[in-house]
Design a protein with these regions (language model features):
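Active-site helix of classical SDR
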Residues: 83, 120, 128
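Substrate-binding pocket helix/loop in short-chain dehydrogenase/reductase
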Residues: 59-60, 67-72, 172
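Conserved NAD(P)H cofactor-binding loop of Rossmann-fold oxidoreductase domains
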Residues: 52-56
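Residue(s) in the substrate-gating loop at a strand-loop-helix junction
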Residues: 103
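Short, flexible catalytic-loop segment of classical short-chain dehydrogenase/reductase
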Residues: 9, 147-157, 196
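C-terminal substrate-recognition "lid" of short-chain dehydrogenase/reductases
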Residues: 80, 180-209, 214
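Alpha-helical segment proximal to the catalytic Tyr-Lys
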Residues: 88, 133-137, 200
Length: 215
């Protein structure tokens, strides 16, 4: 069984219409009380995939304290809360698998105007490796996915909001060594692999999927 959570009811409804076999639940993963209620109804969890994320644009000079706090709350604290709540169940069943969404803009490389975003994604790398090291004896694996630029609706919105959308799109493509963006399906395929028993000997690893951007 697969359960998808999101703070956006419209997103969940659309997802459920496309994939009617999955369960959906509205959840703010930055709210510990909501997380506790959600997981209280679930006895067994094989895989937890943390994919929530927020991108703040700007250097440290454009990053106010509220931007820093909001970015870390959404990108890092949400994972901390979700993992901490689910770990007792995984420890009890002596098996578990956690996948966290990081980015190549992290400890892997820097990118202009992604100051706090890169800091949060680097924190996720450390979080992932620490969980993997602490709970390996409980047969719990923890890995991270580090995408480059992915063609998603949010990416399309960013391009459309640019002063010159045509130029913005060309500039994005020009920065890609392979000459294209990643697809959401390619990221999902890596997540499925990490969630499967085929990756049973892999833990504590950050997996770049960036078309060569981090070379």
């Amino acid at each position: 069984n697969v359960t998808a959570t999101d703070i956006n009811e419209k997103t969940l409804k659309s997802l459920n219409e496309e994939f009617p076999n999955i369960k959906v639940s509205i959840l703010d993963s930055t709210k510990n009380d909501e997380i506790k209620v959600f997981f209280s109804k679930i006895d067994k969890v094989d895989v937890l995939f943390n994919a929530v994320g927020y991108v703040h644009h700007g250097t440290i000079m454009e990053c106010e304290e509220k931007d820093w706090d909001f970015s870390f709350n959404v990108n890092v604290k949400s994972m901390y809360l979700m993992i901490k709540e689910i770990l007792p169940k995984m420890i009890k069943q002596n098996k578990g698998n956690i996948i966290n969404m990081s980015s190549i803009v992290s400890s892997l490389r820097g990118l202009p105007n992604r100051f706090v975003y890169g800091a949060t994604k680097a924190a996720i790398v450390g979080l992932t490796k620490s969980i993997a090291a602490d709970f390996i004896k409980s047969n719990i694996r923890c890995n991270a996915i580090a995408p480059g630029t992915v063609h998603t609706p949010s990416w399309e919105d960013r391009v459309a909001a640019a002063p010159d959308p045509v130029k913005a799109k060309k500039d994005f493509i020009a920065r890609q060594p392979m000459g294209r963006l990643a697809t959401a399906e390619e990221i999902a395929a890596l997540a499925v692999y990490l969630a499967s028993d085929e990756s049973d000997f892999i833990t504590g690893v950050v997996h770049p999927i960036d078309g060569g951007m981090s070379i």
